[in-house]
Amino acid sequence: MAAKVYVGNLSWNTTDDSLAHAFSTYGQLTDYIVMKDRETGRSRGFGFVTFATQAEADAAIAALNEQELDGRRIRVNMANSRPAGGMGGGYGGVTGQYGANAYGAQGGYGGYGGQPGGFQQPGGFQQQGGYPQQGGYGGYQQPGFQPQQGGYGAPQQGYGAPQQGGYGGYNGQSQ
């Protein structure tokens, strides 16, 4: 069964081919990719390598984690699997303080770590104004980024209508 490995802290100069070359020593690769910014085409500093078997993936993790590739000490571990029919990417939207998730975005565009379109106030309504997403236009979230509340200052008080579209991307349930 295929096993997907996350490779983080990549050099901006690491390409799909150089990533494959470094990992192919440890087994048969079925897929490999360095994630790139959709606007600039530049590496986002992480990628994924899929091995044919779990044993090959484990061998690569043991051998390459904290080793140098293209001048950077890379981090290698098993990729987080998403349940089938899950949230479609990102971290599943931000819920309000009381667990409400009535109008929340359900993650970017189904990519790797896509940001939701807006943040919610307690009660299930989204905050108005600002541009709270951090990953471009609902794109890929770089590991280590933590979602922040607010756009241009303190969170809005009270409740308003849910944000509709705008730069936040898709604002419905992604099922």
From Swiss-Prot:
Component of endosomal mRNA transport that regulates polarity of the infectious hyphae by transporting a broad spectrum of cargo mRNAs from the nucleus to cell poles. InterPro entries: Nucleotide-bd_a/b_plait_sf, RBD_domain_sf, RRM2_NsCP33-like, RRM_dom, SLIRP/GR-RBP-like. Pfam families: RRM_1. Residues 3-81 form the RRM domain. This is Glycine-rich RNA-binding protein 1. GO terms for cellular component: endosome. It comes from the Eukaryota. Keywords: Endosome, mRNA transport, RNA-binding, Transport. Disruption phenotype: In the yeast form, results in slower proliferation as well as increased cell size. Does not cause an increased amount of bipolar cells and leads to significantly longer hyphae and empty sections at the basal pole.
